[in-house]
Design a protein with these regions (language model features):
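Acidic, low-complexity intrinsically disordered segments
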Residues: 25-77
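N-terminal start-of-chain detector that recognizes signal peptides
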Residues: 1-5, 44-47
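N-terminal acidic leader/helix
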Residues: 2-35
Length: 77
C-alpha cells in the first residue's frame, strides 16, 4: 500500500508525497500532468508497482472532479 500525502494541484499538475507502507523512510514525490495524465516528476526514478498504484489513485482523484483530499491510500490485492 502507498500512503499519499500532501495532495495538491499546481496549475495543470497534481502533486503528492508518497510513502510506502512499512517503509516510512522510503518515500517519493510524484507529479502528474492533468491534461496528458503522464508523470512529470518521479523522485523514485523507476516505474514500479508503488509508483503505478500511486499514479492510478491520483488520476482517479482528479477525474472525479471533486476537491482533492489532503491524504489518500492506494491499495491492491
Amino acid at each position: 500500500m502507498v500512503v499519499i500525502k500532501n495532495i495538491r494541484r499546481i496549475d495543470h499538475k497534481v502533486a503528492a508525497d508518497c510513502y510506502i507502507e512499512g517503509k516510512e523512510t522510503e518515500h517519493f514525490y510524484l507529479e502528474i500532468d492533468v491534461l496528458t495524465m503522464e508523470i512529470v516528476t518521479n523522485t523514485l526514478g523507476e516505474m514500479n508497482a508503488y509508483v503505478f498504484h500511486a499514479m492510478q489513485k491520483l488520476k482517479a482523484l482528479v477525474l472525479t472532479g471533486n476537491k482533492l483530499p489532503a491524504t489518500a491510500m492506494s491499495m491492491w490485492c
